[in-house]
Curated annotation (Swiss-Prot):
Encoding gene, per UniProt annotation: IGHV2-70D
Disulfide bonds listed in the record: 41-116
Name of the protein this chain belongs to: Immunoglobulin heavy variable 2-70D
Lineage, top ranks: Eukaryota, Metazoa, Chordata, Craniata, Vertebrata
Pfam families, per database record: V-set
Region spans: Framework-1: 20-44
Organism name: Homo sapiens
Amino acid sequence: MDILCSTLLLLTVPSWVLSQVTLKESGPALVKPTQTLTLTCTFSGFSLSTSGMRVSWIRQPPGKALEWLARIDWDDDKFYSTSLKTRLTISKDTSKNQVVLTMTNMDPVDTATYYCARI
């Protein structure tokens, strides 16, 4: 009986609960000062055209806290860190399940690990 109940409960869970969400960042390991950094976030397990969905870019400089950079929402609303907004552009390609961040005029102070996240 316990096995049957577990199976029935599993079958009644909506399929979106069982899907695995993954996000993977790609881009150059290094850029030179004054160059433009272009990073791509390729994701699966959700659709950025679904109401309420959003993807953010964050970074973490060595030995420092996380810093939020930018966010794009399902309806193409865009939000940027006030201190970096003149250097950042975020865009999405829902057909490829990708979000792209570009950051102009790179500087050594921009040294960090860059992450995308569904937040």
